[in-house]
C-alpha cells in the first residue's frame, strides 16, 4: 500500500483543534429536530401542526418535505402512523441518536487494491492552477465540459478516481473501459446509492459485466445520516462531483456524467492542478473508506459464474430410475414429459392400464434405454448426441430394494424411488407378479418439481463449443505443418547438385569471401545448415 493511502499521514490528523467561536444555536436546533420527528411519524399534517403550535416558520420546501419523507427509514417495530405514542419520548429510550462512531473502528476499511499514486504527506505537487469551462460554450467547442473530462481520462496514466451522483454517459464510460482494459489504468468509481440502479442498467444494456473489469472498482456511498429518538433515520445523498487524475489533476463542478448534462443542461467544470489536489486526494480516500460494495442482488452477473449450461450436472443423486419402475409406479402428470402437450399420449394411457390391472402380463414393449423415451423429443435435432443405452436379459436372480433419492432425467425433478436389480430385454416374455410390486409400491410418493432445463439447447451448446475448440486446434496444427514444410523446402534448395560451371563459379565466390567465412563460422559454431538459414 502506498504511503498516501494512510489517513494518519494527512496533515492535521488527530491533532487538537481550536474551539470555533460559532453560535451553537446556528449549528444545532432542537425544535427543528422535533419537527422532523413529527414529519416522519405523523406525516405532513402533523408537521404543519407542530410548526403552527411552536410558531415556527417552515424551514423545509415542498420538494424537501417529499425527499425527507421518502428517505426516512422507520424500524419495523415502530409504526409510521403514530401508534408509538405510548413510548417514552423523554430520552429514556435507548436510541441511535446518542451513539457515536468511534475514532478508531474495528472494521477494516477497504483497500485501494489496484494501486494509488505514491505521494507522501505534504509533498509538493506543483503550482496551483485553474482552468474554467462552461457549457454550452461559444468558442471552438460547444460541449467544452464533456470534452475536457474525456481529454483528462485519455491522458491518465496512474489512476482515475471519480465521485459522482450520476454515471450514465456512454462516451465517458467507454473511455473509462478503454483506460482500464487497454492501458491498465486503475479506475475507482464512488456512486451515490440512489444512482446505482441506473448505472447497472446501463452496464446491462452494453452487455458489460463489472466482475470482468479487474482494473475497475465500483462502490456506493451515501450522505450523512440523521438519527431520531424513535429509531428512525434519514440518509442524505451525495452531491459531490469531482474526478481525480494521477493525483495531481482534478475536475470538479456542476457537470454530471450523463447525456442531459452533456447536451442539454448548462453546466460548468473547473480543472485544477497543483498543490490543491492534495485536499481532493484526502477526501476521496475518506469517502472510499466509508463506501460499501455493490449489492449482491443488483450486481451485474458474470457470464462464467451464472452460466446455466451445466447446472443440471451439479448435485445430482447417482443413478436414474430403471425402466421397470416406469411400468410399476403411477406416473405423475408433471413428470411425463418436458412439454405440456404430451400429457395424454397412448403410451401413457397404456401404462395406466397396466397399473390398474396388476394381474395382467407385463407390457411386451420394453424400454431398452434407462433414460426413458421421454428424452427423445427434446433431443430431436439434426445431429443429436448419442446417449449410452443398456440392453440386458429379463431373468431375475435377486431383488435388492433400496430407497434412494434420484433425479428424473427427462424433467430434471428430484424424487425418492426404489432401486430394484431387475434386468429386462426387448423380447416379449411373460412374467408372474411377485412381491417386488408390493415393495416398489411402498416407496414414498414422488414429489414433482417444475422443469427448468432444456436438454436440446444444452447439448447443442456443448456441440458448438466442442466444434469451435476442435477448429482452433486444427488451424494451429495446419499452421505448424505449413511452417515445417516451408523449412524443409529451404533445406532441399541448399542441397541441390549444381552443374560444373556453376560449381566453379560458386567456389570462386567462396574464395572471394574467405575472410568473412571465419567470422561466420565463429558465430554459427557447429549449428546445422538448416538452423543457419533461419
Curated annotation (Swiss-Prot):
CDD domains, A to Z: PLDc_FAM83D_N
Location within or outside the cell: Cytoplasm; Cytoplasm, Cytoskeleton, Spindle; Cytoplasm, Cytoskeleton, Spindle pole
One record GO biological process: protein localization to mitotic spindle
Main location: cytoplasm
Region Disordered, annotated ranges: 320-372, 501-534
SUPFAM superfamilies for the chain: Phospholipase D/nuclease
Biased composition range(s): Basic and acidic residues: 350-362
Family of the protein in this entry: Belongs to the FAM83 family.
Protein name (record): Protein FAM83D
Originating species: Danio rerio
Gene: fam83d
Amino acid at each position: 500500500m502506498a504511503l498516501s493511502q494512510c489517513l494518519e499521514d494527512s496533515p492535521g490528523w488527530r491533532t487538537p483543534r481550536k474551539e470555533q467561536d460559532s453560535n451553537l444555536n446556528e449549528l444545532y436546533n432542537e425544535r427543528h429536530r422535533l419537527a422532523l420527528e413529527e414529519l416522519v411519524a405523523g406525516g405532513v399534517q402533523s408537521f404543519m401542526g407542530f410548526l403552527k403550535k411552536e410558531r415556527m416558520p417552515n424551514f423545509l420546501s415542498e420538494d424537501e418535505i417529499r425527499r425527507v419523507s421518502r428517505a426516512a427509514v422507520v424500524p419495523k417495530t415502530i409504526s409510521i402512523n403514530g401508534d408509538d405514542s405510548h413510548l417514552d419520548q423523554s430520552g429514556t429510550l435507548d436510541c441511535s441518536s446518542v451513539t457515536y462512531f468511534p475514532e478508531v473502528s474495528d472494521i477494516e476499511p477497504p483497500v485501494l487494491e489496484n494501486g494509488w499514486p505514491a505521494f507522501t504527506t505534504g509533498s509538493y505537487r506543483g503550482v496551483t492552477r485553474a482552468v474554467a469551462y462552461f457549457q454550452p460554450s461559444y468558442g471552438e467547442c460547444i460541449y467544452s465540459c464533456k470534452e475536457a473530462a474525456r481529454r483528462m481520462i485519455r491522458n491518465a496514466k496512474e489512476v482515475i478516481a471519480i465521485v459522482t451522483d450520476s454515471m450514465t454517459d456512454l462516451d465517458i464510460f467507454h473511455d473509462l473501459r478503454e483506460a482500464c482494459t487497454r492501458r491498465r489504468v486503475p479506475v475507482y468509481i464512488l456512486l451515490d446509492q440512489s444512482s446505482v440502479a441506473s448505472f447497472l442498467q446501463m452496464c446491462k444494456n452494453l452487455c458489460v459485466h463489472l466482475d470482468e473489469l479487474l482494473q475497475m472498482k465500483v462502490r456506493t456511498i451515501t450522505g450523512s445520516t440523521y438519527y431520531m429518538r424513535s429509531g428512525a433515520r434519514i440518509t442524505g445523498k451525495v452531491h459531490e462531483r469531482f474526478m481525480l487524475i494521477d493525483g495531481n489533476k482534478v475536475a470538479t463542478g456542476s457537470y454530471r456524467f450523463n447525456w442531459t448534462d452533456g447536451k442539454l443542461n448548462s453546466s460548468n467544470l473547473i480543472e485544477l492542478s497543483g498543490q490543491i489536489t492534495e485536499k481532493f486526494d484526502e477526501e476521496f480516500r475518506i469517502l472510499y473508506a466509508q463506501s460499501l460494495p455493490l449489492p449482491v442482488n443488483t450486481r451485474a452477473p458474470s457470464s462464467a459464474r451464472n452460466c446455466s449450461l451445466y447446472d443440471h450436472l451439479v448435485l445430482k443423486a447417482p443413478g436414474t430410475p430403471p425402466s421397470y419402475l416406469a411400468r410399476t409406479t403411477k406416473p405423475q402428470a408433471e413428470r411425463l414429459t418436458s412439454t405440456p402437450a404430451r400429457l395424454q399420449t397412448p403410451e401413457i394411457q397404456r401404462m395406466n392400464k397396466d397399473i390398474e390391472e396388476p394381474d395382467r402380463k407385463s407390457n411386451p414393449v420394453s424400454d431398452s434405454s434407462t433414460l426413458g423415451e421421454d428424452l427423445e423429443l427434446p433431443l430431436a435435432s439434426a445431429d443429436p448426441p448419442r446417449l449410452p443405452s443398456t440392453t440386458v436379459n429379463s431373468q431375475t436372480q435377486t431383488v435388492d430394494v433400496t430407497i434412494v433419492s434420484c433425479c428424473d432425467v427427462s424433467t430434471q425433478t428430484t424424487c425418492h424411488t426404489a432401486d430394484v436389480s431387475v434386468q429386462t430385454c426387448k423380447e416379449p416374455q411373460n412374467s408372474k407378479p411377485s412381491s417386488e410390486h408390493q415393495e416398489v409400491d411402498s416407496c414414498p410418493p414422488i414429489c414433482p418439481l417444475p422443469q427448468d432445463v432444456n436438454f436440446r439447447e444444452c447439448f447443442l451448446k456443448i456441440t458448438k463449443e466442442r466444434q469451435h475448440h476442435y477448429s482452433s486446434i486444427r488451424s494451429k496444427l495446419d499452421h505448424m505443418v505449413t511452417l515445417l514444410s516451408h523449412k524443409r523446402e529451404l533445406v532441399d534448395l541448399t542441397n541441390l547438385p549444381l552443374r560444373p560451371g556453376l560449381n566453379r563459379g560458386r567456389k570462386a565466390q567462396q574464395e572471394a569471401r574467405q575472410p568473412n567465412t571465419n567470422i561466420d563460422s565463429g558465430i554459427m559454431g557447429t549449428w546445422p545448415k538448416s538452423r543457419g538459414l533461419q
